[in-house]
Design a protein with these regions (language model features):
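Interdomain coupling/hinge region of P-loop NTPase helicase/AAA+ cores
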Residues: 176-178
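Short, charged/small-residue-rich alpha-helical element at the C-terminal edge
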Residues: 180-254
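ABC transporter nucleotide-binding domains
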Residues: 1-157
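Short acidic-hydrophobic catalytic motif
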Residues: 169-173
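Residues that scaffold the ATP/ADP-binding catalytic core of kinase and kinase-like folds
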Residues: 23, 174, 249, 253
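Alpha-helix C-cap/termination motif
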Residues: 131-134, 174, 196-197, 231-232
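ABC ATPase "signature
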Residues: 165-166
Length: 255
């Protein structure tokens, strides 16, 4: 909807002061879009794909090369290779180059790192940081909370509705409850037992820990949870009070 491809059922939105319904033609001239699924022409070469998208916006590779050189420079040695023969990371760089070739004011990225290896993902976010420094506004849709935390502002959404908008730091700071991480030798059994622990408002697996959410209005001491778990024959129990992450905040908003 923000890229003016779909009409909204309700509400309104603007891109750079332009209405997404009334000014859709103007918006399409100032935005770049990289879909989640690789959708360039697989039978065209790297260079041919880039030339095609440049021609759509009446520009050339040479005219905007300075903007894409850090990204395109990494795949330029393979410019005669067909896009369908590129690796996942190289396809990603080509798609981003094509989205930038007309020097957009706003760049939309739809889950750009899904299915990409960790090294390429890290490189990609470093590229985005450099693009931001060049004055391009970047809007990223991502299912990865650690990636969301790299953004200046985030909107947590569920079923098309915005639950909260703020900086990552403020969203974590606004977490309204006490949060503890709990670890024992048997995490699945721990999670099952904690689901029946009445003092806990919520509990869920989080890596090698289980996060336990406690309402601040309830009297709670970690020692009481330790005793409760020992009575259930758990050993090597570790309980720590922690600050909330973006993912903790999102889970709480969903509940």
């Amino acid at each position: 909807m923000l890229t003016t491809v779909l009409l909204p059922d309700s509400g309104n939105a603007e891109i750079d002061g332009l209405d997404v319904i009334n000014d859709y033609k103007k918006i399409r001239q100032i935005l770049g879009y990289m879909p989640g699924k690789f959708s360039l022409y697989q039978d065209l070469t790297v260079e041919e794909n880039l030339e095609f998208f440049a021609s759509v916006f009446n520009t050339t590779i040479a005219e905007n090369y300075d903007l894409i050189k850090d990204i395109y420079g990494q795949i330029e040695p393979f410019k005669t290779r067909r896009a369908g023969k590129l690796s996942g990371g190289m396809k990603q760089k080509l798609a981003l180059s094509c989205a930038l070739i007309h020097k957009p004011k706003v760049l939309f990225l739809d889950e750009p790192t899904t299915g990409v290896d960790p090294v390429s993902r890290k490189e990609f976010w470093e590229m985005l940081k450099r693009l931001k420094e060049q004055g391009i506004t970047i809007v990223v849709a991502t299912p990865y909370m650690e990636e969301a935390s790299l953004c200046d502002r985030i909107a947590l959404m569920q079923n098309g509705k915005i639950l909260k908008i703020d900086t990552p730091k403020q969203i974590c700071k606004d977490f309204p409850k006490d949060l503890f991480e709990v670890k024992t030798e048997n995490i699945p059994a721990l999670l099952k037992i904690l689901k029946g622990y009445k003092v806990a408002e919520n509990s869920y697996a989080f890596g090698e820990f289980v996060h336990v959410v406690i309402n601040k209005n309830k009297e709670f001491l970690p020692e009481t949870l330790d005793i409760f778990l020992r009575e259930k024959n758990f050993e090597n129990i570790e309980i720590n009070k922690i600050g909330a992450t973006i993912e903790d905040s999102f889970i709480d908003l969903l509940n």
